[in-house]
């Protein structure tokens, strides 16, 4: 039963780096895509910046690809990711308990991810946390709604939610920017893939270095 006093009855979670650690699946799939294009990158750590931002833009910015070449890379990435990379992932310790507690308090939960929705829903199903969420919103395979600002606006409109009743939680600047540009409060979490400097520079409503701090902040909202 919803607590009428909840400050933010609706909570939007990013997926990669916030609910799960997708490091292996994403970096190995990027490595695979690059190899298909004749680029050898043996160091997976050098590919971790692909976790979070829109994939197409990340290929363009990192390797100087034009859009057509970047789409080639994205399609090669998906060849591996949809079969193997989806499952090279793990739910962060403490997340299932946090989601259970939030739902128990009456919050309605959503996923808002730049990852294609078809992949996000399969990850949530496979790792058995989909039951906690009213809906899982992601981008389309054609690149529509890969930007967080557009995605969050679409979620708010589709669900009929007032921005002031929503809270976005994410680990990268894109999450914070997307939220703030829609008038949504946001929490930056430091246990994912964005640095504290990156997150604080975008002035989140709260910064939580770890899951314990996140839980403490959420208990007050």
Swiss-Prot record:
It holds the Pfam family HAD_2. One of its GO terms (cellular component) is cytosol. Signal peptide: none annotated. It comes from the Bacteria. Keywords: Hydrolase, Magnesium, Manganese, Metal-binding, Nucleotide-binding. Transmembrane segments: none annotated. It is an enzyme of class 3 (hydrolase). The active site is at residue 14. It catalyses: a ribonucleoside 5'-phosphate + H2O = a ribonucleoside + phosphate. Its EC number is 3.1.3.5. Divalent metal cation. Prefers Mn(2+) over Mg(2+). Its cofactor is Mn(2+); Mg(2+). Optimum pH is 7.4. One of its GO terms (molecular function) is metal ion binding. InterPro entries: HAD-like_hydrolase_sf, HAD-like_sf, HAD_2, HAD_sf, PGP-like_dom2. Belongs to the HAD-like hydrolase superfamily. Specifically dephosphorylates nucleoside 5'-monophosphates to nucleosides and inorganic phosphate. Displays high activity toward 5'-UMP and 5'-IMP, significant activity against 5'-XMP and 5'-TMP, and low activity against 5'-CMP. This is 5'-nucleotidase.
